[in-house]
């Protein structure tokens, strides 16, 4: 079989929401490249591969992992390990295979007598999907102290988390600080890629929603809204029945919503929230079409998807090509942005593709059966080159 190798054209016609317009330059002369091309189709995360004017397949990076309708991140501002009452919540999340994130106030853990708590976190929590967010070196209102003090505290928090192997990426401001641009800038310069704030009694529950509908990123990565859970101390959502409409709205809008809890099952603690109500919240999340995602995971997913670039490098075969080589990347730091995206491949039904073989393999799998002309796989957009071999029914 004669082996043909052509560089394919990448012609880009894309639009997205007004918050994040995207434009890609087409190299000179590439529009006249022969017979094949990969181009963006209507949205910046769908790529269509054609040969001789016929669509072979299209690739879409789904908005949320595994095509879920919405996303929930459960964040817990509590000093896990200081008192066993704080394990109630993490045990409940782990029992339901749901993700959850915990605060790290580094001054509370930097003393040698508390190093065993960090060891327990690594051993008992991280393997079960419990993540960690920076919460300051001290638990103070950083808007009150200016840029320099905030930066020093954020950077110390970041560096200690990294030293302890907690892989810092995201942050949450104590006392609902972070409203000042200087505080946000300090957080960004300290190394965090996003930060959670708090939203007190919004006029509309839609203000809680991050990336609703076609919106591609938060209004402000360094002051993301969250739902303030709690039955006392002026907190907003005292029980599950008050939360349920907010969660339903997130599903309807295809949005991400962050929940902030304090003192779950601890009546003496600030912002007490009944444990039975927390269990109802978790059961509701598990029973509905939510991606239960850590702050780090969801943040990286959104940023990688927005920066996605798929290049069809070449193809092989006589007639309609059977093998394609493509690179999937995002141009971001792969040491920091290492979250798999969910890609959906849709094949032209007339081609009757039954198997797709990947080289290198995806995880431990190299061959995937095609059902109803569709395949979903999880890939990190780390600029790796993949060979895809299409096996058709007639072969």
Outline where the language-model segments fall.
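Short linear, low-complexity motifs centered on an aromatic residue
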Residues: 1-2, 309
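Sec-dependent signal peptide recognition
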Residues: 2-13
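Short, low-complexity, disordered segments immediately C-terminal to signal peptides
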Residues: 21-35
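C-terminal active-site subregion of NodB/CE4 polysaccharide deacetylases
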Residues: 32-83, 179-387
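Metal-dependent polysaccharide deacetylase catalytic core of the NodB/CE4 family, i.e.
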Residues: 70-72, 82, 93-185, 189-228, ...
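Solvent-exposed, polar/charged alpha-helical surfaces in well-ordered, non-transmembrane soluble domains
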Residues: 87, 91, 152-155, 159, ...
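Short acidic/polar inter-strand loop motif in beta-rich domains
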Residues: 393-395
């Amino acid at each position: 079989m004669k082996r043909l190798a052509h560089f394919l054209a990448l012609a880009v016609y894309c639009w997205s929401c007004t918050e994040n317009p995207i434009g890609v330059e087409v190299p000179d002369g590439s529009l006249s490249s022969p017979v094949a091309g990969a181009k963006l189709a209507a949205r910046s995360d769908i790529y269509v591969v054609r040969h001789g004017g016929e669509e072979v397949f299209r690739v879409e990076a789904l908005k949320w992992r595994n095509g879920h309708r919405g996303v929930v991140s459960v964040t817990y501002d509590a000093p896990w390990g200081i008192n066993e009452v704080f394990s109630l919540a993490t045990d409940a999340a782990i029992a339901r295979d749901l993700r959850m994130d915990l605060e790290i106030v580094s001054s509370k853990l930097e003393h040698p007598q508390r190093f065993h708590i960090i060891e327990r976190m690594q051993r008992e929590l991280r393997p079960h999907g419990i993540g960690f967010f920076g919460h300051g070196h001290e638990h103070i209102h950083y808007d009150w102290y200016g840029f320099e003090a905030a930066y020093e505290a954020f950077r110390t928090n970041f560096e200690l988390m990294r030293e302890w192997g907690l892989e810092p990426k995201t942050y949450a401001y104590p006392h609902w600080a972070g409203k000042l641009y200087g505080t946000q800038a300090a957080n960004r310069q300290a190394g965090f890629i996003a930060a959670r704030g708090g939203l007190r009694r919004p006029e509309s529950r839609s203000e809680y929603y991050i990336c609703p509908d076609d919106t591609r990123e938060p209004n402000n990565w360094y002051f993301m809204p969250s739902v303030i859970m709690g039955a006392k101390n002026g907190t907003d959502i005292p029980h599950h029945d008050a939360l349920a409409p907010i969660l339903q709205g997130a599903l309807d809008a295809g949005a991400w919503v962050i929940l902030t809890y304090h003192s779950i099952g601890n009546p003496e603690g600030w912002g007490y929230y009944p444990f039975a109500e927390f269990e109802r919240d978790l059961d509701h999340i598990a029973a509905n079409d939510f991606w239960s995602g850590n702050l780090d995971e969801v943040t990286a997913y959104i940023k990688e998807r927005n920066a996605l670039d798929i290049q069809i490098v070449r193809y092989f075969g006589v007639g309609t090509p059977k093998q394609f080589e493509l690179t999937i990347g995002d141009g971001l730091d792969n040491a920091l942005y290492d979250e798999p995206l969910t890609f959906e491949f849709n094949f032209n039904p007339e081609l009757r593709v039954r198997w797709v073989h990947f080289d290198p393999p995806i995880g431990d799998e190299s061959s995937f059966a095609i059902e109803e002309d569709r395949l979903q796989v999880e890939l990190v957009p780390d600029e790796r080159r993949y060979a895809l071999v299409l096996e058709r029914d007639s072969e």
